[in-house]
């Protein structure tokens, strides 16, 4: 296991004072990306105005690509296969689509910890603890945000370094110390759809999913694992429709 400078950061992102539980919202079906973006932006405004609570929103999108603020246009290899959206989040190009669980995280970091680097580390830990419930060892990397799995079953791309694939991506934005956008975990995603981009600008490593790792796990199973791990790191939740 590789160690990173983020390993020492605290994974406790619970509120520093008593606070209502985080709303836990799950949407069935596919949510169009512009609709999700509008929802998040409005929610951030309302959290800042103290007329809405923090929320985690679990959903799936139809197949599409999003470009983060660091995206290189040359990394969009096949521009017309799926819609492409400017996301406004950090990061580069990524794919979203059916079979991928997205969790948009709208939290007030002023009530928790005003440290974006530590927040990203906590999000990574959330994913790592989620995957551990399925006996998958997820790892972070010093120079790559997200969560990775080592693939000893595959040939090395870089001599002397075991192959590894990305199973979960992180891309956030923080406005007035309120986070939005979030994480995505590949459950049974069609991995061929990543061929239209250079995912997150990384060429030396691939992508994987729970199904690709030999685990035919349902989205519902992943949701339960996400909730358990989230509450360990960020505090209690309450289900909302």
Curated annotation (Swiss-Prot):
Record GO biological process: protein modification process
InterPro entries on file: aa-tRNA-synth_II/BPL/LPL, BPL_LPL_catalytic, Octanoyltransferase, Octanoyltransferase_CS
Catalytic activity: octanoyl-[ACP] + L-lysyl-[protein] = N(6)-octanoyl-L-lysyl-[protein] + holo-[ACP] + H(+)
EC number of this enzyme: 2.3.1.181
Pathway it works in: Protein modification; protein lipoylation via endogenous pathway; protein N(6)-(lipoyl)lysine from octanoyl-[acyl-carrier-protein]: step 1/2
A Gene Ontology term for the protein's cellular component: cytoplasm
Active site per database record: 200 (acyl-thioester intermediate)
Subcellular locations according to the entry: Cytoplasm
Domain spans labelled BPL/LPL catalytic: 50-238
Residues of the site described as Lowers pKa of active site Cys: 166
Record: residues binding substrate: 89-96, 169-171, 182-184
Single GO molecular function: lipoyl(octanoyl) transferase activity
Note: In the reaction, the free carboxyl group of octanoic acid is attached via an amide linkage to the epsilon-amino group of a specific lysine residue of lipoyl domains of lipoate-dependent enzymes.
Protein name per its UniProtKB record: Octanoyltransferase
Lineage: Bacteria, Pseudomonadati, Pseudomonadota, Alphaproteobacteria, Hyphomicrobiales
């Amino acid at each position: 296991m590789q160690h990173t400078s983020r390993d020492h950061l605290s994974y406790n992102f619970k509120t520093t004072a008593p606070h209502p539980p985080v709303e836990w919202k799950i949407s069935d079906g596919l949510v169009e990306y512009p609709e999700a973006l509008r929802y998040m932006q409005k929610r951030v405004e309302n959290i800042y105005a103290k007329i809405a609570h923090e929320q985690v929103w679990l959903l799936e999108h139809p197949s599409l690509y999003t470009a983060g603020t660091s995206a290189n246009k040359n990394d969009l290899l096949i521009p017309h296969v799926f819609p492409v959206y400017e996301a406004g989040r950090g990061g580069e190009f990524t794919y979203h689509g059916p079979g991928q669980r997205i969790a948009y995280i709208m939290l007030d970091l002023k009530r928790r910890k005003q440290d974006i680097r530590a927040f990203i580390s906590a999000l990574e830990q959330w994913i790592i603890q989620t995957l551990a419930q399925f006996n998958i060892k997820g790892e972070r990397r010093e120079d790559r945000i997200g969560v990775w799995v080592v693939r000893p079953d595959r040939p090395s791309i870089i001599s002397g370094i075991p192959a590894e694939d990305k199973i979960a991506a992180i891309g956030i934005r923080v406005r007035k110390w309120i986070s939005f956008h979030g994480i995505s975990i590949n459950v049974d995603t069609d991995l061929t759809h990543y061929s239209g981009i250079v995912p997150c600008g990384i060429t030396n490593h691939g992508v994987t999913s729970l199904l690709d790792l030999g685990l035919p796990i349902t989205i519902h199973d992943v949701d339960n694992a996400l909730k358990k791990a989230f509450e360990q790191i960020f505090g209690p939740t309450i289900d909302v429709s």
